[in-house]
């Protein structure tokens, strides 16, 4: 059937076609101006959805590659640089220690070495204050706190060191009195004229050297005993609990006079039952304790069970020791009581003497059989001197057992290591109450020797990929570094002062001004100084010979740490290369998906424009034609 086509229909159709052409022209113009295939999701939903996914992935890659990996690289480079500097300092110090070990040092050599050691002693730790974007790089999660104190300060810190018996060493103490200060003005006074070579001697003493020197000291020993404590922890055989003597052998705890058995099943009334068997073969002593009760075994030994289930066996014999076992008592509905024990026991050792300075008397207090049970605290040098019996007791511990020392330090110098990065610490600031200090590293007290997880900082540098960027202070900056250098400095200074005093007395003798009693006094003093300087030189050489190996260990550790950082840098570089490749690939995918082809667009737009112009010409004819033109 034929259809009638009117002029109006022709005009409308022509206008619609022209509008379609114009719409296409607008679309191509927008694509050409924006260089994108679409300007709104409705233009092409497939392209839009794909664009969202590709751009999301690309944004993540940009974050990993341009930000995270660059930050990680900066952190690692700064860490490596600091370790490199530290290693160089350690090698230089090792060289000076080797010189001291050789013994052939002139006065000028000694002065130069003393000056250099003094400089290095402060510099060794200051390199550990390196920062990355304001964050301290060696202090774990405490990136807002420097590794060392940046200025002198006075503030009380209560520090608990958790060590093992490898920290017990033996040092040689030389008794020279005040001979180093002899001069022309005082050699004949009563304080100096009595010096002879027979008063000069040296002997070895065992000690635990603490992390710091110049510790707090009170004139009242009761105050010192309240703040300065020494104890050790050891494994316990808990089924049943056995105690066998005055030391810990790794599996059981011993008292001097008894073997002790504690029945976890308790007596008929649910109380803890104890059996003390004397080691002299006497009849066993069996008894039960209620919570809060104390039983005296003999004049020296007693046992207490407190309300919290803590069992304390105290012995005042040889050497003094208090052994504490933590147990938990539980009573069921039937009234039966059982006890559960911790697998570690704490034994306290009494510190017998306290000295403010490293005097001859302080070292003599632990020397010899008469002082075999003594423990002496020296605040100036930060040492616990051990009598022979105490040394043997602690030496018998397993390497896995913990020796715990608590002490206070209030006077801090620039470049002292901040203890909050190493130990359980209570900090008593001006703004805190005396019974409410700031507490750091509390979790260390719950772990043998304070072995808690390192505070590792990692950066995300890829999908499900991260890299460790930080190195913790304990991996390279140990307290022993500075303490060892300080000891060499002190020994060298003592030797140097005795050499100078010897030269002074020798020049007085050679001056010809003195005769008779004064000359005899000078000759005796010269003999004493000669023996003293020989002993001091021998002690210095012996100590430095041992430190050569120790400092080799320090440099090796620094090298290993630097190698570890370098390996992480190498891994990061590989990841960065991969991220760079991924970034390029995804940028191309995004471009292919979103970006328009300019050449193709130009051709299409030119074609559309020609079509549009032609359409305008034809439509103009249609629009001016009416029905009358056909009549």
Language-model-derived ranges and their functions:
Residues 1-152, 527-631:
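Amphipathic alpha-helical polymerization modules
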Residues 18, 25, 29-32, 36, ...:
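Polar, low-complexity export/assembly segments characteristic of proteins
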Residues 289-292, 326-327:
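Solvent-exposed serine/threonine-rich low-complexity stretches and specific carbohydrate-binding patches
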Residues 94-284, 290, 298, 303, ...:
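Amphipathic alpha-helical coiled-coil/heptad-repeat segments
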Residues 295, 303, 403-405, 467, ...:
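Generic structural signal for buried aliphatic residues
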Residues 9, 17-31, 36, 201, ...:
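The ATP-binding site of the protein kinase catalytic domain
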Residues 305, 313-315, 319-329, 339:
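Repeat-associated, polar segments at repeat-unit boundaries in modular proteins
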Residues 279, 293-294, 299, 307, ...:
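Signature of Asx- and small-polar-rich beta-strand/turn repeats characteristic
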């Amino acid at each position: 059937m034929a259809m009638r086509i009117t002029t109006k229909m022709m005009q409308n159709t022509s206008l619609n076609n022209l509008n379609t052409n114009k719409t296409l022209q607008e679309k191509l113009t927008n694509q050409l101006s924006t260089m994108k295939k679409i300007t709104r999701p409705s233009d092409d939903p497939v392209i839009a959805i794909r664009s969202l996914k590709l751009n999301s992935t690309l944004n993540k890659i940009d974050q990993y590659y341009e930000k995270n990996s660059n930050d990680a690289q900066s952190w690692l480079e700064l860490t490596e640089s600091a370790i490199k500097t530290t290693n160089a300092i350690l090698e230089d110090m090792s060289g000076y220690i080797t010189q001291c070990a050789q013994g052939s040092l002139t006065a000028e050599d000694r002065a130069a070495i003393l000056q250099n050691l003094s400089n290095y002693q402060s510099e060794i730790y200051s390199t550990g204050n390196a920062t990355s974007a304001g964050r301290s790089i060696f202090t774990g999660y405490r990136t807002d706190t420097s590794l060392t104190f940046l200025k002198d300060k006075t503030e009380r810190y209560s520090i608990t060191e958790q060590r093992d018996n490898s920290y017990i060493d033996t040092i040689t103490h030389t008794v020279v009195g005040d001979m180093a200060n002899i001069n022309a003005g005082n050699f004949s006074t009563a304080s100096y004229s009595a010096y002879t070579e027979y008063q000069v001697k040296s002997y070895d003493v065992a000690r635990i050297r603490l992390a710091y020197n110049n510790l707090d000291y009170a004139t009242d020993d009761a105050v010192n005993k309240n703040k300065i404590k020494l104890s050790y922890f050891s494994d316990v055989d808990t089924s049943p609990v056995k105690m066998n003597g005055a030391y810990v052998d790794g599996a059981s705890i011993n008292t001097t006079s008894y073997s002790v058995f504690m029945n976890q099943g308790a007596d008929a009334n649910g109380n803890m039952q104890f059996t003390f068997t004397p080691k002299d073969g006497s009849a066993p002593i069996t008894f039960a304790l209620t919570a809060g009760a104390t039983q005296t075994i003999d004049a020296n030994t007693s046992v207490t069970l407190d309300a919290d289930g803590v069992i304390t066996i105290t012995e005042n014999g040889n050497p003094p020791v208090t052994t504490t076992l933590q147990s938990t008592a539980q009573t069921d509905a039937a009234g039966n009581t059982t006890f559960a024990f911790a697998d570690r026991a704490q034994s306290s050792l009494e510190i017998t003497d306290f000295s403010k300075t490293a005097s001859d008397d302080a070292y003599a207090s632990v020397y010899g059989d008469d002082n075999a049970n003594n423990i002496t605290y020296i605040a100036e040098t930060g040492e616990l001197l051990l009598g022979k019996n105490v040394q043997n007791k602690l030496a018998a511990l397993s390497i896995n057992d913990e020796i715990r020392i608590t002490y206070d330090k209030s006077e801090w110098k620039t470049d002292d290591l901040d203890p909050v990065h190493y130990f359980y610490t209570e900090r008593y600031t001006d703004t805190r109450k005396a019974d409410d200090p700031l507490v750091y590293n509390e979790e260390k007290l719950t772990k043998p020797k304070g072995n808690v997880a390192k505070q590792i900082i990692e950066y995300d540098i890829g999908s499900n990929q991260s890299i460790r960027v930080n190195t913790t202070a304990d991996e390279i900056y140990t307290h022993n570094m500075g303490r060892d250098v300080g000891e060499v400095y002190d020994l060298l200074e003592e030797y140097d002062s005795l050499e100078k005093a010897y030269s002074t007395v020798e020049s007085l003798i050679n001056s010809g001004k003195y005769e008779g009693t004064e000359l005899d006094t000078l000759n005796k003093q010269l003999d004493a100084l000669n023996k003293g300087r020989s002993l001091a030189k021998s002690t210095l050489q012996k100590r430095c010979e041992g430190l050569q190996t120790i400092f080799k260990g320090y440099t090796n550790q620094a090298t290993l740490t630097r190698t570890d950082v370098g390996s992480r840098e190498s891994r990061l570089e590989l990841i960065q290369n991969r991220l760079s490749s991924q970034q390029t690939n995804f940028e191309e995918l995004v471009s292919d998906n979103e970006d328009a082809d300019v050449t193709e667009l130009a051709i299409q737009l030119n074609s559309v424009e020609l079509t549009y112009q032609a359409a305008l010409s034809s439509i103009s004819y249609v629009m001016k034609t009416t029905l009358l033109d056909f009549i």
